[in-house]
Amino acid sequence: MDLKSGYPFWSIRNGLMRAYPRLEQDTVCEVAIVGGGVTAALIAHELLRHGHEVVVIEQRDIGWGSTSASTALLQYEIDTPMIELAKQHGMQAAALAYGACAQAILDLQGLCNTFGGTDFTRQDSLYYASRPRDIKDLRSELEARKAHKLPVEWIEREPLWHNYGVHSDGAILSRLAASVDPYRLCYRLFSECEQYGARIHDRTAIASIEPHEPHVDLRTEDGVGVRARHVILAAGYGNQRWLSQPVARNRSSYAFVTDPLHDSDMGALKHTMMWETARPYLYVRSTPDGRVVAGGEDDNIDIPARRDARVQSKLRTLLKKIGKTMPDMRLRPAFAWAGTFAETADGLPFFGPHAELGPRVSFAMAYGGNGITYSAIGAGLLRAQLESTPHPLSGLFGFSRLG
């Protein structure tokens, strides 16, 4: 299925950076990773660095699915606020999830610094109240984060307008966030993976998965066989095709990017990404070359033709919302696009085996607005499971939480 509409900026900016060979003959490996986006790349890189043998199989070109349509906001702030997550799983679990996401940003920073070329940029994150009635819960969210040592402060209405150009009654300012070019990150990771000995194949679709002991047999649509000791399904929202019941719902999100702006026009966006308490939320961030990326207006459409038809009307709505909240921001879109993604009921990901496919097949479902951050956590979690070592998030980020 086509995962995106319009012209995602990252694929236009970077082009097709590298073609990998199709898988054309039977192969045997320790770990087969199905998927070729940034989630698969982070997992492959983690496994290879720790001595595992990896084959990567992607049905499209590498990075050409949801990765190319991502706006790549790297936040510890989960789509579900900490106080709401605590109601579902308890405050200890909520704090564990938020803390792991905070550490993941630092881990991603270290990783990107080792090979460069990803446009990784540390930023602040401004989470502002969409309506006056949101202030009470936003204050409670601030106190919950402070209690667990997260770097946050409160911004009142006047300094919010004076320093950030945002009309709102209050906001949480977080000092730990970042942005990245997801497409470049994906390719840089896979380039590193090749140096560790990975075999990477694109334009190769998997038609069947047959778990056995002590291996798993995969078969491509062209009839080529792959026998692996372990399989990791990291194919984005398409992972759900392998389960009889969905564990997440598919949605579409809409975004645009401007031409480069002068520094004087960028204002606080140069160093601060901004998003709101409303759901679905509006978000705005900058790129290192002075562009503004904005998006939101999520809906339940995942039929490509219907999603395609909505891109321009969603663009107009996004511009109207930005104009209302940030009236000094004059934005002229250069490209607009939409992408299909999935989200879970509690905003948390799923990493690990599912009873339907047994212990040798693991899922990597980094769903929600924290996809790249979740993937960085999931890479370590899946390695721990592969090596039969405990991980503090195996339960919370596993299918067992579904009951």
Describe each PLM feature range:
Residues 308, 323-403:
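C-terminal catalytic lobe of FAD-dependent flavoproteins
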Residues 49-69:
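Glycine-rich FAD pyrophosphate-binding loop
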Residues 29-56:
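N-terminal Rossmann-like FAD-binding beta1-loop-alpha1 element of flavoenzymes
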Residues 144, 171-222, 226-229:
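Helical element adjacent to the flavin cofactor pocket in flavoenzyme catalytic cores
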Residues 208-287:
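Flavin-dependent oxidoreductases
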Residues 69-100:
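Glycine-rich active-site loop/strand segments that organize a redox cofactor
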Residues 1-31:
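Extreme N-terminal leader/targeting segments of oxidoreductases
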Residues 2-13, 80-85, 110-188:
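Flavin (FAD/FMN) cofactor-binding and adjacent substrate-gating region
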